[in-house]
Amino acid sequence: MAQPYLSIEHIDKSFTRNGLTSTVLRDVNLKIEHGEYISIIGHSGCGKSTVLNIVAGLLDPSLGGVILDGKEVRGPGPDRSMVFQNHSLLPWLTVYENVEVAVNKLFKRSMGKRERRDWIEHNLALVNMGHALNKYPQEISGGMKQRVGIARALAMKPKVLLLDEPFGALDALTRAHLQDEVMKIQKDLGNTMMMITHDVDEAVLLSDRIVMMTNGPSATIGEILDVKLPRPRDRIALADDPEYNHYRRAVLSFLHERHRLH
């Protein structure tokens, strides 16, 4: 049997503070195939971001491990790019230079100067930021900053793109536009994506599978919902789609039941 592209295997995570140990995650198992879009959803404090940070290599698991493309994750690496809710752009660099920093760090030896420039411009064009190469972060909107963050992550040629509530700080219209752009990028490039979200509609719209976490402490995966809506997905058409609303109700029901039990 073929190994999954990304495997989260029997992860536990505990933190000790002032002599007291708290178990945040217990026995988290998840297999992700190449090109899948996975969303993780759950109530605040259920360890969603902890799972993502362990996959990113920013946190070590207390037990278990993460296997990506046949290799164990042991710390951060360029094969896993992360996009945060906060765009994390360097304010003293232009849009182009913010992406250039990452590209030069990874590809200065393997790409020529012209090739690197073309690659940077290509990734900024993917997120419709080709017109703003020379602008500074303070000169562009929040949605544009997040576009640059996504372009920078894609320019690193990651095996997995990790998204930690990437649209959470944006207004509804900007969020919808960016969601549509991410769907198009994933369709065109076939990226493997793993996203943390609190937004049920976002999870159903974007995902191939939705991973629903139980409440903490000792949170784990409660249910996994396969979202079999055909792609490409049109948010307007889906608003009245019975299947879309079935998936939406299933996630809301899980979250409501977990909240009631908590």
Residue ranges and their predicted role:
Residues N104, M111-A132, K184:
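Conserved ABC ATPase "signature" region
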Residues I150:
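Hydrophobic anchor residue at the start of the ABC signature
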Residues A56:
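Helix-to-loop junction immediately C-terminal to a conserved catalytic motif
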Residues G64-P76, G112:
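Conserved ABC transporter NBD signature motif
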Residues M1-Y5, S14-D27:
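A short, flexible loop at the N-terminus of ABC-type nucleotide-binding domains that lies
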Residues I41-H43:
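The feature captures the beta-strand-to-loop junction immediately N-terminal to the Walker
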Residues K135-Q138, M156:
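Conserved signature/switch motifs of ABC ATPase nucleotide-binding domains
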Residues L93-A102:
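Short coil-to-helix segment of the ABC ATPase nucleotide-binding domain corresponding to the Q-loop/switch region
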